[in-house]
């Protein structure tokens, strides 16, 4: 230990520091920046419901998808010890969930309520109350009862312009302070125990104060607070008169940035550590004025140690520090070393939390207030997600948690056992028993090359004997699933292409991998080892999925790959599946009919069934619409708990995990989803019994285990109603709305049109219309399908029962029409952004403010050459209808008259009605005749599409 020395004087001389104050009175009118807006709330009856400490946590598993376990820790947030007497219980965060972990019983109680990652949390001095907050645009602060695990109060939109970066309870836990993440940061104090939705005090900090990221109350005085950043410390005071004092120290510390500060336990002082091993002691006085700068004789600099101090806290008249070496030191108020813990084998320390009770009774003579006492157990967390418990009386410690501290992109379930493999970007691999909740085997880079990022893994399909692991370097290793060891002969390195997908064949004899170079690599088991067969570049854009199947006429495996280029590829064929949508994933559809189908999900919220032999689209269905398209799907195995005998599909979107009842039919009530990883899902897998789904969160360094309840999903689906009732909710106005009446009118008009508009015979009403009327009817309902989409739609109805009856369907009723319309139309219509993108791709800058414009001749050429090319007759018919042109006389050539100006009246030429330069507004309003839209029709600056994108789309 280093005592104060002469070097401290030099440090003081090199520092520039100041301290000033701000006062503001309680008043309703606004005050200037840096002053406080006081909002007085009447005292109301408290909302906190007391629960006994021995009450059990209650978990709600009556939802289709419920969170069961969180594997992983947010290492940037502190870990708090809640109980350390008969049971060891502590609190930490992972992703958007708070976790109360009972180490004694190996159980978790999960604090769910946030839709964004938890950015900060705190506990009260008595460990009774917990506060969690996030940084979403609609930031939320939730206060929890640590005994029951239920939320007791929620603050919505408390910092809407950036979220919350720090929170803290007052010493008596009656108030809560929040520090915002806004551009101009705000500090708010809340009377949370009452029905409070507005802060008692609020101030906006000046930019020169720097970015504050930490705030606490003085535990002995609830009218005093401090906040700090890496370069500044602010002190606040609220008194009965309503004044709010702010002390600011601005300096440039020679040794390094500051760490979070604390209050002295007895004196009116603030202790501020630095990354240079220095502690600054601020002696404050009660007679400071607003914006006053503290003189130098009020600041003491103590050079405590050589290594950076990352954590400083005070407990029982002791000063406790944690540093970058993972050491914990205890000092008295004179900075004399009392004890130390240097053998914890930790990386830089993030937090130190002490138990609220002693291991045994100390100091019965009542000298605890004056003498330092080393009697409380504590937990220490590190930057690498390790949590260690230290028993002070026995001077022993044990590791409580050693979780992932790197992004997770690989997860796979064993085909026969309750085991799931998890791999992260540091090359670490773990196998976890999701029934007993403990790790079975770990491979922390042993046998794996250092620096390898583990991107994908999968178990062999039969007994799970092998575990194939793919790395970002392009390497593929075959590991023994029981030992996680590999034979050097079964480690294949093909740099530098990253492995993105892996799949075993049904007989576990083949393994296929997809790499970032758009190719597929194939391996085969040739006893006694795996061998490399070859690599095939099957796509010209990234591969989104690959899948093994079995030939219908043999037991030989066949391999399918799916790409962003919209191609479905196997060794025998290649077929373009979509015109504009991008397929995201695929899987085998369960045998619900005599045909074998591949189900493919696209970025347009659609799911399509393709015949595995003919590759024709047999059905188009509306998929889950929960904010982002489905990116991965899997058919869950039938379990013993599945009383209905139905089939189910699990899926993940960008940030959600969900469950879908099969068969797919577009019913929105047959699907449920919940937020799983707000920062994005990187991988998912499901258990062999279909009762658990696992999601990897990538950058949030967590794997979440989700328990499935099929009965809850079936119950939710039943609430949606029968027959067409669920589909009416997807129509504007519902069953009794104007749009539904329009559908009925058009439906019966199609019957009249089919019977002849000028027919004088008695009309024969029918519950069905012929399929020939379907394309026109869809366009009348403002859905404009392409010719390929029309063909898919007609085939879907025409061949709907062909495999069962051998007959074609030639007509359709109103109920089937409504389902067909809902499933085929764009899920969210045509957006202005899509039109803007099209003009950016096709046009050239030349309009006002650099907006893209399209040349008239260029547009006509594109319509006749690209995509589904139109003939001149079709163009003439379209523009005649759009512009209301008169019909051409019988003795005139319609093709020549419409496109040429020779010997033709000006009223029939395109030049007279279409401007030479076409902007987005002209195309939308003048040509298409659509109503004026919002100002959102503004192209993104600096963006220009390419001909390659045009060819693809």
Can you name each region flagged by the protein language model?
Residues 2-101, 234, 280, 286-290, ...:
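Intrinsically disordered, low-complexity acidic/Ser/Thr/Pro-rich linker and tail segments
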Residues 71-72, 111-113, 156-159, 203-207, ...:
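Surface loop/turn motifs at the tips and blade-to-blade linkers of beta-strand repeat domains
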Residues 76-81, 117-122, 161-169, 209-217, ...:
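Canonical WD40 repeat/beta-propeller blade segments in eukaryotic WD-repeat proteins
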Residues 86-89, 108, 128-132, 153, ...:
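Structural hallmark of WD40 beta-propellers
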Residues 94, 133-137, 179-183, 228-230, ...:
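Conserved strand-to-loop turn within each blade of WD40 beta-propeller repeats
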Residues 100-108, 138-153, 183-201, 235-248, ...:
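Per-blade loop-tip surfaces of WD-repeat and WD-like beta-propellers in eukaryotic adaptors/scaffolds
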Residues 722-766, 803, 808-846:
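EF-hand Ca2+-binding helix-loop-helix modules
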Residues 802-846, 861, 865-870, 881-953:
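EF-hand and EF-hand-like Ca2+-sensor regions
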